[in-house]
Amino acid sequence: MRQTGLASLPLKSLAVAVLLSLAGTPALAADIPANVDGARIIAADKEPGNWMSTGRTYDEQRYSPLKQISDQNVGQLGLAWSYKLDLDRGVEATPIVVDGAMYTTGPFSVVYALDARDGRLIWKYDPQSDRHRAGEACCDAVNRGVAVWKGKVYVGVLDGRLEAIDAKTGQRAWSVDTRADHKRSYTITGAPRVVNGKVVIGNGGAEFGVRGYVTAYDAETGKEAWRFYTVPGDPKLPPEGKGMEIAAKTWFGDAYVEQGGGGTAWDSFAYDPELNLLYIGVGNGSLWDPKWRSQAKGDNLFLSSIVAVNADTGEYVWHYQTTPGDAWDYTATQHMILAELPIDGKPRKVLMQAPKNGFFYVIDRATGELLSAKGIVPQSWTKGMDMKTGRPILDEENAAYWKNGKRNLVTPAFWGAHDWQPMSYNPDTGLVYIPAHIMSAYYEHIPEAPKRNPFKSMYQLGLRTGMMPEGAEGLLEMAKSWSGKLIAWDPVKQQAAWEVPYVTIFNGGTLSTAGNLVFEGSADGRVIAYAADTGEKLWEQPAASGVMAAPVTYSVDGEQYVTFMAGWGGAFSTFAGALSLRAGVQPYAQVLTYKLGGTAKLQEPAPRPDTPKPPALSNDTASIEAGAKLYDGYCSQCHGIHAVSGGVLPDLRKLTPEKHQMFLGILFGGRVPDGMPSFADAFTPEQVDQIHQYLIKRAHDLHQEGDTWKQFSAKSSH
């Protein structure tokens, strides 16, 4: 049942929650389920059986003191239970576990409350996300999880709402629309954090042209407490606070006002209770090309920056910019970890981050001073770090595409050396465990200033990037050039202690434990445990799908469990579908929970249907070429470049005869339950036919190249 309005609802209303078998469930064992507050999170080590915040603790270390499962017995792990999610798309959530109840999310921000002992559903809450707006999300209809506080569960909804749910009943308590401008493509995929009674959430949308900000809301009522903008607005208007006074001086011209400027804080936060500082990871610019965004001038603060603000007021305190004047989608939204490290023989309270640009940063978290920075993967865009200025040294010949007149092959590329998949820190080993990428892509300046496209589901990048060969052999060669690895990084020595290779990128986030273990899922469909000190693989089982999310561990009734959220999807398998086929998996979304001696059976997806024979190929090459351009501009971000899908959304080369007959109706009518908008305002019937003819041509290519496509899947031997 759809809920409307922003007011609190009566408790007797069930919203869209499903209540099952409430009597005797662990969620009701406590007087108030999910009864978490700041003091409890700060003292989390006193109750290590719970996982009460996204990173377990405010320092976001993703380290658990539990050690019933250890390097001595992890080989005895077996599946304890599984729970099948409703929709097979990308799964990125970190579950929250409190007092025997698990709270997690699936695609389109659906929230599940499960019995952490056996996976029984307690309730399910569907926020009825406006699914036709899924095309306004850059990277699939994903969600990275919830927050809990004093009996409420908080979720950011894909369409821009923040909602509070009663943890006992699954009913909506309040809802707020976080969007500052409904004409812009704002979305939410990140997990909220709750600090000092305030729910903090950012947003996504920089690829579509928005202005980024972070907002804090009263956890009890949903009333806005403060908002911090990450990039300046109209220079004709007064700046919003000290932060924007500083930032405005680093932007030039006024093109960014129409473009939005970007700087969305779509994922990472951390909090230091002693300093009362909230750390915000800020994203890329709108547009990507700095010439069209800011006349190729200025640092464009606070793009690609870590910003510290007062947690109570949202007032600016300090910033450190990882990539001044970002031009490559080198966000600083990646996971931040707070720790105390020995630096030059003295203990320092630091913030650590491995953002997309390939450096690993150690920063004084009180002042923002850069203490050290080293590259964790090959970097063609920079010649190193100037420690006197704290700025990377740009390699203009190999990366400054907006002024060197070249199509530059840049490493790392837009999904970075490390993306949203969380890293973890183990204070016992002193190592940070990073799910890293090795990838390159072309960036090319366009000679004319781009005009904003009014169609809200269209990328607004201001350059050419992501170019790939069309033929299967060229795509296979490119796919083999992208790889992943798990890096155990020593943040004091700034060097790798050990590494484990993977066949492709987008492997899962990591969890480390006092049992000398590191857990990680892989893109090619495995869940794995390594020895935290040496990297030796100690345990592995199939996961029935790719695993991108970070696992958690908890205990109930004295028994330790490890949970992975499995489900292939996200940006890699949509936009770069052909390259993602290296993983050799299909989307199959489920919660997988393991314990010592577990004997449950893994659920597997059904085999894919055979590829239909395509209709007759048109000899109208002009229409096919026109259709290719339209497809590239409007369709590739979801269905894949060159119409090669990674399997999360339909591969349009494999349409059935019925779908070919319905093609015009599908594009003009949309498929809202699946997240596909109507394109009636974007295309004429003639243009739809051109796209259709192009897809038929690509279907014929598929049949001719069939043997090569069979070589794409390459499961890792590790």
From Swiss-Prot:
Residues holding pyrroloquinoline quinone: 92, 144, 189, 205-206, 264, 356, 419-420, 571
Family annotation (SMART domains): PQQ
Catalytically driven reaction(s): 2 oxidized [azurin] + a primary alcohol = 2 reduced [azurin] + an aldehyde + 2 H(+)
Binding site for heme c: 635, 638-639, 676
Subcellular location field: Periplasm
Record has Kinase as a keyword: no
One GO MF term attached to the UniProt entry: calcium ion binding
InterPro entries to which the protein is assigned, alphabetical: Cyt_c-like_dom, Cyt_c-like_dom_sf, PQQ_b-propeller_rpt, PQQ_MeOH/EtOH_DH, PQQ_rpt_dom, Quinoprotein_ADH-like_sf
Cofactor requirements of the protein: pyrroloquinoline quinone; Ca(2+); heme c
Cofactor info, note text: Binds 1 PQQ group per subunit. PQQ is inserted between disulfide Cys-138-Cys-139 and the plane of Trp-266.
Domain Cytochrome c: 622-699
Cleavable signal peptide: 1-29
E.C. number(s) listed in UniProt: 1.1.9.1
GO biological process: electron transport chain
Catalytic residues (positions): 329 (proton acceptor)
Residues engaged in binding Ca(2+): 207, 284, 329
Protein keywords: Calcium, Disulfide bond, Heme, Iron, Metal-binding, Oxidoreductase, Periplasm, PQQ, Signal
CC terms in the record's Gene Ontology section: membrane; periplasmic space
Disulfide cross-links: 138-139
Noted pH dependence of activity: Optimum pH is 8.0.
Control of this protein's activity: Exhibits higher affinity for 1-butanol compared to 1,2-propanediol but inhibited by 10 mM 1-butanol.
NCBIfam families hit by this protein: PQQ_enz_alc_DH (TIGR03075)
Function, in words: Catalyzes the dye-linked oxidation of primary alcohols to the corresponding aldehydes and the (subsequent) oxidation of the aldehydes to carboxylic acids. Active with primary alcohols, glycerol, 1,2-propanediol, 1,3-propanediol but not with methanol or sugar alcohols such as D-sorbitol.
Quaternary structure, from the entry: Monomer.
This protein's name: Quinohemoprotein alcohol dehydrogenase ADH-IIG
Gene name in the database record: qgdA
